[in-house]
């Protein structure tokens, strides 16, 4: 099954997450099919906190990719 989920990057105590499309059997930070955005929870005041390529996100959900709970929460937060 193909899922859209967060892959952690960054450093200790400085998390940075890539929003990726991957096979559900792959590791959290392992191989992925496509990167569709990022989420920076510790972004500075003037910098971008979340970016999503909505066209690619719509494509992948259209072909049956499941969205993880964390990514669904980010989508809802960005829409508001």
UniProtKB/Swiss-Prot annotation:
GO terms under biological process: translation
InterPro entries, sorted: Ribosomal_bS16, Ribosomal_bS16_CS, Ribosomal_bS16_dom_sf
Source domain of life: Bacteria
Keyword Disulfide bond listed: no
Any one GO molecular-function label of the UniProt entry: structural constituent of ribosome
Keyword terms: Ribonucleoprotein, Ribosomal protein
One CC-aspect GO term: small ribosomal subunit
UniProt similarity note: Belongs to the bacterial ribosomal protein bS16 family.
HAMAP family: Ribosomal_bS16
PANTHER family given in the database record: 30S RIBOSOMAL PROTEIN S16 (PTHR12919), SMALL RIBOSOMAL SUBUNIT PROTEIN BS16M (PTHR12919:SF20)
UniProt name for this protein: Small ribosomal subunit protein bS16
Gene: rpsP
